A protein has these predicted regions:
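Long, histidine/aromatic-enriched segments associated with O2/redox biology
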Residues: 3, 48, 53-74, 79-465
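N-terminal secretory signal peptides
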Residues: 1-49
Length: 465
């Protein structure tokens, strides 16, 4: 729910047109011919799943997902709400200079999961897990089952290696993005479990406390994370479900979240979506076509702290509960004052249309600023933040109701940035945001997102090199 400067006239780059090949993972979708889903995935690493991964697929069952708070109920809800995948044939590559799912055009659905590495897991077993995850992710992003044999073609005397709920469904633009939390490098008790404490980027630290934080322990942190985005919720759920089974005995879900209705656009080809407050959100989000801005604000560069992270990014996750019932009783003019934009057009209250640059000096008939000094737009705008920008990939969420009948809903905020300081500066600037009266932050996490996997390689390979 941050504000960014609208792009000028961005130059098209590889990835903005579906029919143009691109060199990076996630930048260019392809539409496979009918029947192509049965072919081996060209983008998959050549190695297969380890014996331990296959054991996990055979023995984990639903246990891996049950470890996540509310995960079972959430999965059931997502599957039952699955939209028709007819025509959803977009396929993104898994390997490339950067991981897919960052500058990739934001899909409509999300399943996010944070994991804890199991006690007793060794460095070699962690590496093997990342290799197994990469193999499976490369297959699933191409519309394949998680491993040979799949849901129905294996031994009838053994559990299927694939859960099968994505049988017959296309790839649906699935992207799978991996991240490493601070506690992967140094455990909370100070232990260097995997011999990588000295490779932790200096910036990768637990986020400080912010105004409005009401964090729940079960919605924070994680050694690892996986972000699965797709245009069909069942495809995204299938990905997290099977990756969790593969992790059995090595890692388990700490917490997870389902999201719908993206709350930002990451491509100029996408219209601005609305959040659950009913306002257009992320009007001026960083777009993938803004190549110079993406390089400066999103990707970690050579010389930035840890060399192994060059080409990667930092992911900040915040679960923001909206106090829906209070907001719904607010007058329209109050809602617009809080946001700083009109609810219909999304134009700044200083005048113009949605993409008109806000004029923070404009005053009305009473000599009061047309855009309130505590409005979200003013406080989060890059001109107020020395040019700081974030690339957002947030989603709406509804997790039922609380025991008082109030809607448990809001924004699952995700932003990618070159340095965590960018997010910290923005969030601190929002300390006096008028919106704080209507929201509370209940979940929080930060992860280092490594660069993309090389062909036949695996995500995280640079960290353990």
């Amino acid at each position: 729910m941050t504000e960014h400067t609208p792009p000028t006239t961005p130059a098209p780059e590889a990835g903005s047109t579906p029919t143009t090949p691109a060199p990076e993972a996630g930048s260019t979708p392809t539409a496979p011919e009918p029947g192509a889903a049965s072919a081996p995935p060209n983008d998959a690493p050549r190695r297969g799943l380890s014996r331990r991964a296959l054991f996990g697929l055979a023995g984990a069952g639903a246990a891996g997902l049950a470890a996540g708070a509310g995960a079972t109920a959430a999965i059931t809800a997502a599957v039952s709400a699955s939209a028709s995948a007819t025509g959803v044939t977009t396929v993104y590559p898994f390997s490339g200079a950067h991981q897919s799912g960052i500058t990739t055009p934001a899909q409509d659905r999300l399943h996010f999961a944070a994991y804890d590495v199991s006690a007793g897991t060794t460095r070699d077993e962690l590496i093997e897990l990342l290799q197994d995850w990469s193999v499976a992710a490369a297959r699933m992003t191409q519309g394949q089952e998680v491993a040979d044999g799949g849901a129905v073609d294996g031994s009838p005397l053994a559990p299927p290696v694939d859960t099968g709920e994505a049988l017959g469904l296309p790839a649906s633009g699935l992207t799978i993005t991996f991240g490493f939390g601070p506690t992967l490098f140094t455990a909370e008790d100070g232990t260097d479990r995997f011999g990588i404490a000295d490779r932790r980027p200096a910036e990768l630290e637990k986020l400080p406390r912010f105004t409005g934080d009401n964090l729940q322990a079960g919605l924070t942190g994680g050694d690892l994370c996986i972000q699965a985005c797709a245009d069909d919720p069942q495809v995204a759920v299938h990905a997290i479900r099977n990756l969790s089974r593969i992790a059995f005995g090595r890692a388990s879900i700490r917490w997870s979240q389902l999201g719908f209705g993206r709350t930002s656009s990451t491509s100029t080809s996408q219209v601005t979506p609305r959040n659950l407050f009913g306002f257009k959100d992320g009007t001026a989000n960083v777009k993938s076509e803004e190549t110079k801005t993406v390089e400066e604000q999103v990707w970690v560069q050579d010389g930035d702290s840890a060399a192994w992270l060059s080409g990667g990014s930092y992911l900040v996750v915040r679960k923001i509960r909206m106090i829906i019932e209070t907001w719904d009783r607010a007058q329209l003019q109050e809602q617009e004052r809080v946001i700083g934009r009109s609810k219909g057009e999304g134009a700044p209250l200083s005048g113009g249309k949605e993409f008109t640059e806000p004029d923070f000096d404009a005053v009305g008939a009473t000599d009061q600023p047309l855009i309130d000094k505590h409005s979200h737009v003013r406080l989060a705008h890059p001109t107020q933040l020395k040019g700081t920008k974030l690339l957002r990939r947030g989603y709406n969420f509804v997790d039922g109701n609380d025991d008082l009948g109030r809607l448990n809903a809001g924004l699952f905020f995700m932003s990618y940035q070159r340095s965590p300081k960018q997010f910290i500066d923005v969030q601190r600037a929002l300390a006096t945001d008028a919106m704080n009266e209507y929201i509370k932050h209940v979940g929080s996490a930060i992860f280092a997102v490594p660069p993309g996997a090389r062909k036949d390689g695996w995500v995280g390979e640079t960290l353990f090199a």
